[in-house]
Amino acid sequence: MSDYKNYLANQVMMGKMNRREFIGRTVAAGVALSSASTLFATSAEAQEPKKGGHLKLGLEGGSATDSKDPGKNLSQVTFVSSHNWGDLLVESDPFTGAPVPSLAESWEPSKDAVTWTFKIRSGVKFHNGKDLTVDDVVATLKRHSDEKSESGALGVMKSIKDIKADGGNLVVTLNEGNADMPLLLSAYHLVIQPNGGLDDPEAGIGTGPYKMMSWEPGVRATYEKFPEYWRTDRGFVDSVEIIVMNDATARMAALSSGQVHFINRVDPKTVGMLKRAPNVEILSTSGRGHYVFIMHCNTAPFDNNDLRLALKYAMDRETMVKKILGGYGKVGNDFPINSTYALFPEGIEQRSYDPDKAAFHYKKSGHDGSVLLRTSEVAFPGAVDAAVLYQESAKKAGINIEVKREPGDGYWTNVWNVQPFSTSYWGGRPTQDQMYSTAYLSTADWNDTRFKRPDFDKLLLQARSELDEAKRKELYHAMAMMVRDEGGVILPMFNDFVNASSKKVKGYVHDIGNDMSNGYVATRVWLDA
């Protein structure tokens, strides 16, 4: 609750929220009316964010193969980078997940939620001096709808039938009604680029608070404040530097010694040590992120569902949460949705570690010999240790898992979504529809388990157009059961996003949407020194 109040207070300080809105949202969150009024008065008098300074981020996840094309954002580094230099049409509220305006300042659906009209913000400039127009928006969305783009948003864009300009408005027509449609446009790949990025998707030119000055994939990137940025509540520092630090020990040392202001992916095992550092603050956020072991359902031996079930029952989830997450997370149930999502399908039995059931399904599968699991320290914090733990728990069921540690550099292009059994992570998505459309729809480019089921696709489309919430929830329940019992994902844990910063860093927003303040860490914080 304190994080939410701090966030609302910052909105008041920056003139983004009036008294009525502030009190309404704090009362809705369970704060008494009298207390909300006092909080508003205090917030209005609070210190404004400080401007200036050079912000340094030490980030894990960078690779020599990183791309500046937002459609190909694969790593933590490119995720933050595109938020530095670019904007989306729609964002999600960091605490509720509801859609909030960005480059689209308002929207209106048709009665059947099939056609949506978005008013595009005027007076916005790209870093190259060009004014933002609705044509840039149309071109961007069409590029990400093209199979050749290899965009991570392609699964989401397949629900769109037509995209066109109407004066200063964007008109989007869907294949079927979807009440969640605005949140589809908050997919982090859909950064608006001049002419949609068709001229050069790697240009790194957008409308964001920082202009990209240099880019060395897998090494570093630098940005300078864009003086004509259209928002007043973002972009407080003068410049930003991302330094790729894939080694967890090096990141921790860099933060402790003051070489950087912020690091991501703090290993839970080192949190206690970092807490003892006098100038360090731990930033832990619960959300929709999850760590996974992914099997390709169309590749032997994982095309046998009994083998997949054996490997699911061979996972000791409680031990994973305790030893890998250090308690910074919760047990998963082999489908990618948790209770932070609207219409969460309750009542699904929690899958537990069961060596006997694992042995039963393993024998039934007819598989003989070891199973090769590829992993790397960049897959998620503690991924290599998690693979070894999994190897040990599976051994008790008579299953031999061979663990192969792969190099971090190139993991996201050479192993993930390529090899048939590997470790990975997902940051979650704003809605169930978007999560399933991105990673489980048969035609999605990022269907990393090769779960291709026409009956599942049909349920997804039915749920998308179903406006009755009770019926929609039933459909999501059926989809979750199908993924859980027949899919290729082993999801042992939903992770908290554990990062750390210098105490000089102020204004950090804990965002349920995704890691590192949903990618906006550099644009939301300021330096108090």
Q: How would you describe each model-predicted region?
A:
Residues 119, 152-195:
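Surface-exposed binding/hinge segments that line
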Residues 330-363, 380-385:
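Structural transition elements
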Residues 1-21, 42:
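N-terminal secretory signal peptides
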Residues 58-111, 142, 205-207:
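N-terminal lobe/hinge region of extracytoplasmic solute-binding protein
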Residues 80, 91-98, 185-241, 247-249, ...:
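Gly/Pro-rich hinge or "lid" segments in bacterial periplasmic/extracellular proteins
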